């Protein structure tokens, strides 16, 4: 049984964080209530705040607290956490805000969260010392990245991750692979990579005399895929795409409809201003970008550390907010490789049962 902050995970499933605004309190709370681990995406989480354009940083800080509180009302005793990208501006401040809000866990990817334990420890100093620190989980895609994290945390922070999320090449949104790696990592090849990462986790679990559960993510949209993940040695699975077409998902109906209407051929790779390939549903917006067009940013809301507004082909904040709020055809609709399999709306609890029954 996986334990997160002394709470037992009743169902071995994490709902993946999806931003901007796809997995907020509604979805995360519903998943936690159903026995899984619900994940709120911190990416531009305050986009609905009336003051967002004026001061996105402060709006995001307010929303981290308010979204967590709303999710906790839905699931008073469930496991609820945050996904916070390392590539975000104010990453450290957002981590501290999530800790102070009371998050059960933190999942950090889009870069290596080398100093996450230090940031969290500092945040905990200002809190009631009887409170438990959140569980910390890096997102890794290769054995190499896993070893880098484990070695660094051991040397600098004298600790190991509380669990690890392995994100495979079939995942949605930003991918931890270069485009040429995506063609290299066939199903069989990546299986070997998964087994190697699991071995790294087991090695350090023995070294630190603690359990380090492994959560496998990417393309897990059917019971068969879930069963296969467990057969490889995963302790739990993470699913995201399947949860988009749920009634509780925080995205607009138009966003969900893009999933429901998508064919297998509509799932494409698009370059992101983050510097990584991303997987998305093909639409008017993606056609413009992939044909060499540019949609110049109107304003900068400071979402990414290394963004050059004068150079990027589009503003990812604008593109994601446009789609999630209802204008899906003119925005970026991130998705997993199996989004085309989504053909009806359902409840989050039903998704969990269909994957784990």
Question: Where do the language-model regions lie?
Answer:
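Active-site entrance/lid segments in N-terminal catalytic domains of soluble metabolic enzymes
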Residues: 1-207
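Generic detector of short alpha-helix boundary/capping microenvironments
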Residues: 3-7, 19, 164, 217, ...
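Conserved active-site-proximal phosphate/metal-binding subdomains
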Residues: 14, 171-215, 221-357
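Residue-level detector of alpha-helix initiation sites
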Residues: 22, 220-221
């Amino acid at each position: 049984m996986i334990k997160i902050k002394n709470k037992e995970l009743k169902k071995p499933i994490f709902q993946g964080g999806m931003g901007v605004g796809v997995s907020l309190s509604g979805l995360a709370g519903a998943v936690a209530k159903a026995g899984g681990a619900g994940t709120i995406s911190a990416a531009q989480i305050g986009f609905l705040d009336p003051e967002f354009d004026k001061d996105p940083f402060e709006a995001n800080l307010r929303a981290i607290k308010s979204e967590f509180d709303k999710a906790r009302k839905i699931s008073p005793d469930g496991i609820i956490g945050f996904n916070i990208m390392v590539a975000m501006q104010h990453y450290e401040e957002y981590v501290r805000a999530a800790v102070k809000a009371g998050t059960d866990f933190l999942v950090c990817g889009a870069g290596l969260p080398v100093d996450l334990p230090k940031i969290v420890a500092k945040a905990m100093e200002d809190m009631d010392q009887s409170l438990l620190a959140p569980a910390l989980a890096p997102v890794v895609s290769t054995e190499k990245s896993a070893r880098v994290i484990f070695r660094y945390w051991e040397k600098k922070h004298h600790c190991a991750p509380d669990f690890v999320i392995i994100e495979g090449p079939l995942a949605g949104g930003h991918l931890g692979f270069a485009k040429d790696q995506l063609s290299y990592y066939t199903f069989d090849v990546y299986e070997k990579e998964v087994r190697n990462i699991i071995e790294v986790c087991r090695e350090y679990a023995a070294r630190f005399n603690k359990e380090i559960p492994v959560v496998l993510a990417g393309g897990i949209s059917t019971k068969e895929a879930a069963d296969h993940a467990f057969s490889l040695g995963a302790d739990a699975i993470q699913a995201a795409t399947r949860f988009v077409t749920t009634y509780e998902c925080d995205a607009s109906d138009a966003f969900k409809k893009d999933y429901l209407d998508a064919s297998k051929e509509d799932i494409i790779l698009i370059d992101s201003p983050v510097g990584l390939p991303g997987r998305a549903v093909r639409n008017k917006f993606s056609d413009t970008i992939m044909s060499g067009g540019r949609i110049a940013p109107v304003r900068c809301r400071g979402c990414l550390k290394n963004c050059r507004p004068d150079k990027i082909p589009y503003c990812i904040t604008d593109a994601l907010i446009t789609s999630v709020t209802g204008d899906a055809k003119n925005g970026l609709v991130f998705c997993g490789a199996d989004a085309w399999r989504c053909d009806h709306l359902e409840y989050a609890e039903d998704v969990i049962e269909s994957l784990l029954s």
